[in-house]
Amino acid sequence: MIIQDVELVKVARTPGDYPPPLKGEVAFVGRSNVGKSSLLNALFNKKIAFVSKTPGKTRSINFYLVNSKYYFVDLPGYGYAKVSKKERMLWKRLVEDYFKNRWSLQMVFLLVDGRIPPQDSDFMMIEWMKSLNIPFTIVLTKMDKVKMSERAKKLEEHQKEFSRYGEYTIIPTSSVTGEGISELLDLISTLLKEN
């Protein structure tokens, strides 16, 4: 997929804020500070998604219109302890409504920090998506920060951890070096063309 144009068209804080569904869309979810915005900017080859060093900055569902026909959707991060319980529940309801009611959703990309073992919150997200029959692909982020001598071991550890849920594609990426970006775009292109 070649991304020719991208525009942030909607910042949704309630389900009523969602734009009408298009032919297809993909969503990106992960723990706070996993690198969602940086990965989106790498996919877009443009700095459009706000990047912050402070966890929990994405507090809405952000819809990016790509090539005037598809949505790339940035979901709020999970697992950030300093956010109030009330706000976490609001995010959970917002994301749950999105998962249940967006018929145009083709795939969720679950972003996991490749430097560390998957966290309990990552497993909870997988179980939640599986319970809702949401298709997903696992994307390891920040792989540029993993020493070359440790990469094979880290990938193997992640594959072993996630294998309890079945066989899933795992794509190692880096928004800094561009690793995995074209592979991810190719997968997205295939998904959106099929539907």
Swiss-Prot record:
Protein name per its UniProtKB record: Probable GTP-binding protein EngB
Which positions are annotated as binding Mg(2+)? S37, T58
Q: What GO CC terms are in its UniProt record?
A: cytosol
Q: What is the lineage of its organism?
A: Bacteria, Thermotogati, Thermotogota, Thermotogae, Thermotogales
- One Pfam family per UniProt: MMR_HSR1
PROSITE patterns registered for this protein in UniProt: G_ENGB (PS51706)
Q: What does this protein do?
A: Necessary for normal cell division and for the maintenance of normal septation.
Query: What are the entry keywords?
Result: Cell cycle, Cell division, GTP-binding, Magnesium, Metal-binding, Nucleotide-binding, Septation
Q: Which cofactor does it need?
A: Mg(2+)
List of residues binding GTP:
30-37, 56-60, 74-77, 141-144, 173-175
Q: Which GO terms describe its biological process?
A: division septum assembly
Q: Can you name one GO molecular function term for this protein?
A: GTP binding
Boundaries of each EngB-type G domain copy?
Answer: 22-194
Under InterPro entries, the record lists:
G_ENGB_dom (IPR030393), GTP-bd (IPR006073), GTP-bd_ribosome_bio_YsxC (IPR019987), P-loop_NTPase (IPR027417), Small_GTP-bd (IPR005225)
PANTHER family given in the database record: ENGB-TYPE G DOMAIN-CONTAINING PROTEIN, MSS1/TRME-RELATED GTP-BINDING PROTEIN
Q: Which family does it belong to?
A: Belongs to the TRAFAC class TrmE-Era-EngA-EngB-Septin-like GTPase superfamily. EngB GTPase family.
